[in-house]
Each structure stands twice: as C-alpha cells, then as structure tokens.
Design a protein with these regions (language model features):
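Extended substrate/RNA-proximal surfaces in nucleic-acid metabolism proteins
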Residues: 1-97, 101
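Charged catalytic cores and adjacent phosphate/nucleic-acid-binding surfaces used
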Residues: 76-86, 90, 94-177
Length: 177
C-alpha cells in the first residue's frame, strides 16, 4: 500500500524509479507486516541497502515489476559527456562486466577515457585486474564509493581505498581537462 502523492513527492520531473516505489511503500506502518517488504526493514536480510535491493529484487530485467527502458547507446552517452566538458569513465565494471576482456575492449573502442579501478564493489583481485588493464590501454584510473545517499546507506563517501594515490588521480583528471 502506498500513495501516488508520496511517489510524486520523491520524483523529479515526473521520473519514477524502483527505489522511489520501495521508499513510498515502506513509509506506511501497515506495510511493516507485509512479508514481501519485511526483508528491507531494519535488521531484515536485505536491509543494508533496502531501496536498491528492492529495485534489484522486483524491478530489474526479468523481475515481476520490470518496465522496459530504452537507453541511448554507449557512443551517444560518451559524445554527450565529452560535449558537456566531462570525461567518460566506466564506473565499477566489476559489478556488471566482471573480467570480460572482449567487452571491456569494445567499450574502450567507443571512446571511454578511464576506468573506476578502485570501487566499493571491487575485490583486491579485481582492483589489480582493472589497474593492469587500464595501464595497458593508457586509460585514466579513478576511485569511487558509489555513494547514493539514502538509497545505498551502507556505502559512505570516502569509504573506498585507492592505495594512497588520490593526489595522482586528481592531478591526472585535472590535466585531462
């Protein structure tokens, strides 16, 4: 049970996502007893990042509440980032691409300029893999926690170690611009 009013108050420009639906549903006290939502409340098995976990459990591709989204191509995204003065960086590849070298090479052939080597999602082995891959392909190395505020409360800003090379990363990013 939840209201359109709550969902609309959480959305920007009428755009609604699965995390917002989870937050709206969890605001109602009577939903605390709903067996579908119980894992997302405090001390539940999915409570570490409840809104994002709800999204992956119910709204992701192949799940009951999935709605198809038409995304722009990678090339279009890279062009928009560069036209806006940004640097196209591949974020936390260990979370979705893993160590698929063929896919990584396809992605960099589109014009990606760097890889988020240091990520809250990466194991030490993945950090080493992406560091070697990035250096081999002369890509920028970056670091990110993937902090998203209330949607990922278990992740904190600055909570990702980048082996003491913060200044080098920042310097290289500044030189690129």
């Amino acid at each position: 049970d939840f209201s359109d009013e709550i969902i609309n108050s959480l959305s920007r420009n009428g755009v609604v996502n699965g995390e917002m639906i989870a937050e709206a549903a969890m605001k109602f006290d009577k939903n605390h007893e709903n067996p579908l939502l119980m894992p997302y409340y405090e001390n539940g098995s999915r409570s570490d990042n409840p809104y994002v976990n709800f999204y992956w459990d119910y709204c992701a591709q192949g799940k009951a509440a999935y709605a198809e989204v038409n995304f722009i191509s990678l090339q279009e995204a890279i062009n928009i980032i560069e036209e806006s003065g940004g640097i196209p960086i591949l974020a936390h590849p260990g979370n979705n691409i893993k160590e698929n070298i063929n896919l990584l090479e396809q992605i960099i052939s589109c014009g990606i300029k760097g890889i988020e080597v240091y990520s809250s999602y990466h194991s030490k082995e993945q950090v080493e893999f992406y560091k070697k891959f990035s250096l081999k392909h002369k890509l920028l190395l970056t670091c990110g926690s993937d902090f998203h505020g209330k949607t990922k409360p278990s992740i904190v800003i600055g909570g990702t170690d980048c082996e003491g090379i913060e200044d080098k990363i920042i310097s290289q990013l500044k030189c690129y611009c």
